[in-house]
């Protein structure tokens, strides 16, 4: 399973660990992904999504119905 938010599309990015001596080693910054169940009132069921913390805030703001409509338009499975 890929580490990508289903709502925002955020995935891992690469960068450097920098030590006190300023030695650089490559690393990955991973998104804050959570499996979360959202209640969809119109369908009378829970939908389980893998979303980032930012994705949860978007769902809080726009509503789960609007976000699911966008996911269905993109052909996303959930």
Curated annotation (Swiss-Prot):
A GO biological process held by the record: translation
Protein's UniProt keywords contain Ribosomal protein: yes
Record carries keyword Ribonucleoprotein: yes
GO MF terms held by the record: structural constituent of ribosome
Domain of life of the source: Bacteria
Entry's Gene Ontology cellular component terms: cytosolic large ribosomal subunit
HAMAP family: Ribosomal_bL28 (MF_00373)
Annotated family: Belongs to the bacterial ribosomal protein bL28 family.
Listed name of the protein: Large ribosomal subunit protein bL28
Gene name, Swiss-Prot/TrEMBL: rpmB
């Amino acid at each position: 399973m890929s580490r990508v938010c289903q709502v925002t599309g955020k995935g891992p990015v690469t960068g450097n660990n920098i030590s006190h001596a300023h030695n650089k080693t490559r690393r990955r910054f991973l998104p804050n992904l959570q499996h979360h169940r959202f209640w969809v009132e119109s369908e009378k069921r829970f939908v389980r999504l893998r979303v980032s913390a930012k994705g949860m805030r978007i769902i809080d703001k726009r509503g789960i119905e609007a976000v699911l409509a966008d996911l269905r338009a993109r052909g996303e499975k959930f």
